[in-house]
Design a protein with these regions (language model features):
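Short glycine/proline-enriched loop/turn "hinge" motifs that connect secondary-structure elements
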Residues: 111-114, 219
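C-terminal substrate/ligand-recognition segments
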Residues: 114, 123-127
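Primarily the internal scaffold of c-type cytochrome electron-transfer domains
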Residues: 1-60, 66-68, 89-104, 126-301
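A short, surface-exposed interaction/processing loop segment used at functional sites
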Residues: 72-111
Length: 301
């Protein structure tokens, strides 16, 4: 999470790939490294637009990286992103098949104030104060204070050594439902996606939303919470067997509502949380809608 956003100077992907190029329709794109900066350009063969890359979002991840561009004081989301699976550039998620009206639109999508709050608010720390962007005080990546709120007030109260000390909320005391909503502030909650009214495979990457739809989901059972399987202070394990003990915490047998699997007791998530390709995302996400998956069944949106 500490690399959810990187400055262009420190982006390993941009450093390791000093020249990237791709075509999309009638437009040609290029990202070139110049010293410790990277320039993003798009041309229609007649006119060329060049923008400096300011930040890389999703930096150095196994999935990909989208770029935040700047021109005339405005920020833009790059129309092309880098994808690990492609080892190169491809249309940014959500822009595939979209026909830009002109060269400027082909370069990137103008970010609204709400876009900036949402993107920087989840990919960085101290990027906003209420509804006010504070990019001058922003710390790239998800740092301690992003989740452990009120740490500054806690530090100040301890240094003063007078009065009642202030302690940050204990996240370990959150119920499963509260934890889903807490993580869902960035990973999307059930309520947020359900209110959009668009149940589709595009929601595969929103884990709290998908988890809530599982038959075994219990808002008060800590064994099905986000942190029961994932330690936010560590990288997510890609080994299926690393989650077996978590599954067996409920499915060891003895309870009718949580029978042991008759097929296997190892690599449970391989069958019950299958990896599904996100269209346009060039990555297979583990579906957190835990279930008995049957061949040929439609995707449970």
């Amino acid at each position: 999470m500490a690399h959810a956003l990187e400055t262009v100077e420190r982006s390993k992907i941009l450093i390791d790939h000093p020249l990237l190029s791709a075509n999309n329709g009638r437009y040609s794109y290029k990202i070139e490294r110049k010293g410790d900066q990277s320039l993003y350009s798009v041309t229609d063969g007649i006119t060329t637009i060049i923008m400096p890359i300011r930040w890389a979002m999703g930096a150095s991840s196994a999935i990909g990286q989208t770029y935040i561009l700047e021109k005339d004081g405005q920020l833009y989301e790059s129309r092309m992103s880098w994808f690990q699976q492609l080892h190169g550039l491809g249309p940014t998620l959500g822009s595939a098949g979209v026909l830009p009206a002109d060269l400027h639109e082909a370069a990137g999508r103008l970010m609204s104030h709400g876009d900036k709050l949402a993107c920087f608010g989840c990919h960085a720390s101290n990027a906003a104060h209420g509804d006010q962007l504070t990019l001058d005080k922003m710390i790239p990546g998800v740092q301690c204070g992003h989740c452990h709120q009120e740490v500054e007030a806690h530090l100040a109260s301890m240094l003063e050594k007078s009065g009642q000390p202030i302690f940050p909320p204990k996240l370990s005391k959150l119920s499963t439902e509260e934890m889903s909503n807490f993580c869902g502030q960035c990973h999307r909650t059930w309520a947020e996606i359900a209110m959009q009214g668009n149940p589709s495979i595009a929601n595969i990457r929103f884990q709290p939303y998908r988890l809530t739809g599982s038959k075994c989901y219990d808002p008060d059972d800590a064994r099905i919470s986000c942190v029961a399987c994932h330690n936010p202070h560590e990288e997510v394990s890609a080994k299926a067997e690393d989650y077996d003990a978590k599954c067996q915490a409920c499915h060891a047998g003895g309870k009718a509502e949580a029978n042991a699997c008759p097929v296997s007791k190892s690599k449970c998530v391989t069958c019950h949380m299958p990896k599904i390709e996100l269209p346009g995302g060039h990555y297979k996400f583990s579906d957190h809608h835990i279930r008995i998956v049957r061949a040929g069944e439609p995707y449970p949106g």
